[in-house]
Regions:
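Alpha-helical solenoid repeat scaffolds
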Residues: 1-197
Length: 197
């Protein structure tokens, strides 16, 4: 099915069938928990997390559930565990357009987690930490990095950040078809800083 309502109904039926085994952990239960969370079945998520083995995905869902419960400190701790659990080069492929995402997004779990951590830091008014976290997700979330760099940080904060975290440009790297016509996030951030100065 390609209709969003049909897909959600299919997911709900699948979750209901598989959730009959929530009294114990089973292979793939972390994915079932994530699917239940995504479909808004939060009581089921809470129930399933009681028996789930800890891994990056369950830590990530626990972070989201802690945010739903208003426990920002617990959410931050779970996000840290989740971020440490995924290899930086793990990818899950494309996520199609939805109400939350405009266009396709190439899902890299650690990038997504860092971006969510950055939003949490922004809500705590910890702007430099937000920039550090969002910068770790720079290739996937460049518009968010640019927004923080341009609209949130002061010029001096941005200058200090670039000096500390952004590698100096390499001397005229040859243009290859892979990177032709597009500067790296590092180069774009340096250009943004130059414009602000």
């Amino acid at each position: 099915p390609f209709d969003p309502t049909e897909i959600k109904n299919y997911h709900n039926e699948l979750i209901a069938k598989l959730a009959q085994k929530v009294d114990r952990d089973m292979p793939g239960s972390d994915r079932l928990i994530a699917l239940a969370y995504r479909n808004g079945q939060y009581p089921l998520v809470t129930l399933m997390l009681k028996n789930a083995k800890e891994n990056g995905l369950t830590a990530w869902v626990r972070a989201k559930m802690a945010l739903r419960a208003g426990d920002v400190n617990a959410a931050a701790a779970w996000y840290a565990k989740a971020a440490a659990s995924f290899p930086p080069n793990e990818t899950w492929g494309f996520q199609s357009y939805s109400d939350d995402i405009v266009g396709e997004e190439f899902v890299t779990p650690v990038c997504r987690i860092h971006a969510e951590q950055a939003i949490l830091a922004l809500n705590r008014d910890d702007y430099l930490q937000a920039m550090r976290l969002m910068y770790q997700a720079k290739e996937n979330y460049w518009p968010d990095v640019a927004h923080i760099a341009e609209r949130v940080l002061t010029v001096n904060e941005l200058l200090a950040f670039v000096d500390k975290y952004v590698p100096a440009p390499s001397p005229s790297a040859p243009t290859t078809p892979k990177n032709a016509g597009r500067d790296s996030a590092d180069a774009r951030l340096r250009n943004l800083l130059a414009r602000r100065l």
